[in-house]
A protein has these predicted regions:
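Active-site loop immediately N-terminal to the catalytic Tyr-X3-Lys motif
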Residues: 74, 122-128, 150, 187
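C-terminal substrate-recognition "lid" of short-chain dehydrogenase/reductases
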Residues: 191-215, 220
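Residue(s) in the substrate-gating loop at a strand-loop-helix junction
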Residues: 117
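Alpha-helical segment proximal to the catalytic Tyr-Lys
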Residues: 101, 146-150
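Substrate-binding pocket helix/loop in short-chain dehydrogenase/reductase
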Residues: 72-73, 80-82, 180
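Active-site helix of classical SDR
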Residues: 96, 133, 141
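Canonical Rossmann dinucleotide-binding motif of NAD(H)/NADP(H)-dependent dehydrogenases/reductases
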Residues: 1-23
């Protein structure tokens, strides 16, 4: 599991361990089981080799490593683009590839679930680079699902909406986050527990691949021509 030291990844790991599963977390944080920078091909291969040597080939991979990037397109610089695309797109591809190669060589098949974002399809002028990186992630999932289906490897994603994690901070004290939360039909931000439930459910869907499950409390249901949305008074 990438990004398993905090946030959504940590909650998925906690739930799996509570159920008696063996979990190996990869992260740049010290609390991870294996230190791994997902943007570094050598580090990914080393983490994969160590995981297999110590625990065998995993059959369920949760890829939740990610970084944020705010700012207007006219103001951002190339290094910000490189950073967010390196982690959210390149890092996802490197870890997906490592997972698929391991399961293919072992002949086990299995499930890969990436944690992406509703930002892949909801344009936000203050988060252009992030939106682009998550759109790339969603398409990587779909292409990988098509390519690796003959190997018995399913590839899906869960796309959270506004979720309370260390990456996001406290929505109540962050104006650009509080706005989307106020427009969420279910009336609150998501929690790592909410997204962990979705991730674990998708792993168990044996005849589903190439899908992106939206877990956003209904945020993406809004129509641009219906600004009141769910708050419209009933007749």
């Amino acid at each position: 599991m990438t990004g398993g030291a905090s946030g959504i990844g940590a909650e998925v790991a906690r739930r799996l361990r509570a159920a008696g599963r063996t979990v190996v977390t990869w992260d740049v944080q010290d609390t991870a089981d294996i230190s791994c920078d997902v943007t570094d091909p050598t580090a990914v291969e080393a983490a994969n080799a160590r995981t297999i040597a110590e625990h065998g080939v995993p059959t369920h991979w949760t890829l939740s490593a990610g970084v944020g990037c705010g700012g207007m397109l006219l103001d951002l610089e190339a290094d910000a683009w490189d950073r967010v695309m390196d982690v959210n797109a390149k890092g996802l591809w490197l870890t997906m590839r490592a997972a698929a190669r391991a399961m293919s060589q072992a002949g086990t098949g299995g499930s890969i679930v990436a944690v992406t974002s509703v930002s892949a399809r909801l344009a936000d002028r203050t988060m252009g680079f992030y939106c682009a990186s998550k759109a790339a992630a969603d398409m990587l999932v779909r292409v990988a699902a098509q390519e690796w289906a003959p190997l018995g490897v399913r590839v899906n994603a869960v796309a959270p909406g506004v979720t309370r994690t260390p990456l996001l901070g406290d929505p109540a004290s962050t104006p650009w986050v509080a706005g989307p939360v106020s427009r969420t039909p279910l009336g609150r931000e998501g929690t790592p527990e909410d997204i962990a439930e979705a991730v674990l459910a998708v792993h168990e869907l044996g005849w589903v691949t190439g899908e992106v499950l939206t877990a956003d409390g209904g945020l993406s249901l809004h129509s641009p021509i219906d600004p009141l949305g769910y708050r419209r008074p009933r007749p």
